Regions:
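Bacterial N-terminal signal peptides that target proteins for export
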Residues: 1-9
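N-terminal signal peptide c-region/cleavage motif recognized by signal peptidases
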Residues: 16-18
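C-terminal/domain-edge helix-coil "capping" segments
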Residues: 22-42, 141, 146-252
Length: 252
């Protein structure tokens, strides 16, 4: 991905008169770059084999699933609660961004570098702060109803982790089912002070929980443990809950 600019280089004239100390959050640009894609990671090795990562990955587009809208809504509520009165504006990526693109942008922000389209928006709207919401990559750590943490390899962004071999107990009726589906999120929230072009707070977010087949039903493919509507609801709910925690964590 190209087109990065050092924030000082483009915005220096505008921001030079402002104090270098971290400014109050008066005018914030929220850049939620999550997009609508859903990553499906399927484990293909034995449940206790952690020596080698054997996973298959597939990316699906869930049109209008609204992760960025959720990000904006959560950010507005958190900022208005913690930092009133504050001007607020939400931006989404002009084109879909891959996970690697988003990691590159978040890493660049830590060096005071952002894509040109973001810098132009910062200058135009004279933001005192940027709140950046991106996908991340992390190790699979899936919470089960028994309190265990399972999973092998890595998971990316927002999606579902599938395991066809792990045995899960249904907490409603005690029946056992083979396999699990786990909604998960791996995200990164960064708060950037435009005066200093520095990230002043950052929080990594990792959350996942395992679900068994409903009511002990026999379903060969864990992907079918949830309907399409249930999958959308599970991810939206998890993104909102996790982002709420992350955004509150980076606000002063």
């Amino acid at each position: 991905m190209t087109g990065f600019k050092t924030l000082w280089a483009m915005a220096g004239l505008l921001l030079a008169a402002q104090a270098l100390a971290q400014a109050p959050i008066r005018n914030v640009g929220v850049f939620s770059l999550l997009g609508d894609s859903v990553q499906v990671t399927a484990s293909t090795d034995a449940p206790r084999d952690t020596r080698i990562e054997r996973t298959a990955r597939e990316t699906l587009e869930f049109k209008d699933i609204g992760f960025d809208i959720i990000g904006g809504r959560v950010a507005r509520k958190a900022i208005e609660t913690r930092q009133p009165p504050t001007l607020f504006r939400l931006f989404r990526a002009p084109v879909p961004l891959t996970l690697d693109d988003q990691v590159l942008i978040a890493d660049g922000a830590a060096r005071g570098e952002l894509p040109e389209w973001m810098v132009r928006s910062i200058v135009t709207h004279q933001f005192t702060h940027v709140l950046l919401i991106t996908r991340a990559r992390g190790r699979a750590s899936i919470r089960t109803s028994d309190g265990d943490a399972i999973g092998r390899g890595t998971v990316e962004g927002i999606g579902f982790y599938l395991d066809t071999l792990y045995t899960m107990r249904n907490q409603t009726n005690g029946t056992l089912s083979n396999g699990l589906i786990a909604p998960y999120v791996e995200m990164r929230v960064s708060l950037m002070d435009t005066d200093s072009a520095k990230v002043v707070a950052e929080h990594r977010l990792s959350e996942a929980y395992a679900l068994a087949a409903k009511d002990g039903s026999v379903v060969a493919d864990p992907w079918n443990f949830l309907s399409a509507a249930e999958k959308v609801h599970a991810l939206r709910q998890l993104v909102e809950k996790t982002l709420t925690r992350g955004i509150v964590a980076v606000l002063p």
